[in-house]
């Protein structure tokens, strides 16, 4: 309920972006843009309404598609569509997602590999798919920070996110995450260096943020 207020409170000169499921963007996109939000990433793992509901457990696919349009209209671009490939669930929807972003310069498709923690049955290796896309791409751009490739394929811009296979992704990470139970998480792949910030304010909260930042180090060192 207070997301617009939070965005508005970000000091000038700092770019704000947001990853969202997109279900409320239809009504909030323009207010978020006015508040200073620059762009959005939208998590969307299926374009099939029944499949979408099965994956998310709630919400309507139509709300997300409306949110994508609203974000485009509000200028929250480029919009990255984050699709996590799930084995046996949405593997057959790749062409549908490519069609969704094809020909739209404001949309980028990010196909994300699910982390294979302990032999997850939903994990799907992206190697073969990326090789296929690379082979038939009109143009390939290598991003400087993570050395991640962007493929211009059938009118679509496509990126593959595979942190397990890209040490540069880890070495150049600038993220600090907050867990659902109020802990700072310096590294996506670790749970042994969390910093509890529940109930903390002011200088104490600032001190804990700095302490968490000092715990940051490449996971693959």
Q: Where in this protein do the model-derived segments appear?
A:
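Radical SAM/AdoMet-radical enzyme domain recognition
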Residues: 1-111
